[in-house]
Amino acid sequence: MKPEIHPKYTKVTVNCANCGTSFETRSTRNNIKVDICSSCHPFYTGKQVLVDTAGRVERFKKRFAKAAPKAAAN
């Protein structure tokens, strides 16, 4: 490798914006900020968070309830 052409590889702190957890790793960047980490990600914690975006589930159930009596009548 040629000297003085590679970026410096140093210890950096990775900060999670969601839960506030921080840990050290090595990188060529100064500081790393992540949106979600293994401490708060549902896959790793086993806790699933259901997010109902703008009542889409309720709208679907309402449409399905209207269609069900028509299908039963035929």
From Swiss-Prot:
GO CC term (a single one): ribonucleoprotein complex
Keywords from the UniProt entry: Ribonucleoprotein, Ribosomal protein, RNA-binding, rRNA-binding
Highest taxon, organism lineage: Bacteria
GO molecular function: rRNA binding; structural constituent of ribosome
GO biological process, one term: translation
Subunit structure: Part of the 50S ribosomal subunit.
PANTHER family with a match to the protein in the record: 50S RIBOSOMAL PROTEIN L31, CHLOROPLASTIC, LARGE RIBOSOMAL SUBUNIT PROTEIN BL31C
Purpose of the protein: Binds the 23S rRNA.
Matches recorded under NCBIfam families: L31, PRK00019.1, PRK00528.1
Family: Belongs to the bacterial ribosomal protein bL31 family. Type A subfamily.
Protein name in the entry: Large ribosomal subunit protein bL31
Species of the source: Chlorobaculum parvum (strain DSM 263 / NCIMB 8327) (Chlorobium vibrioforme subsp. thiosulfatophilum)
Gene: rpmE
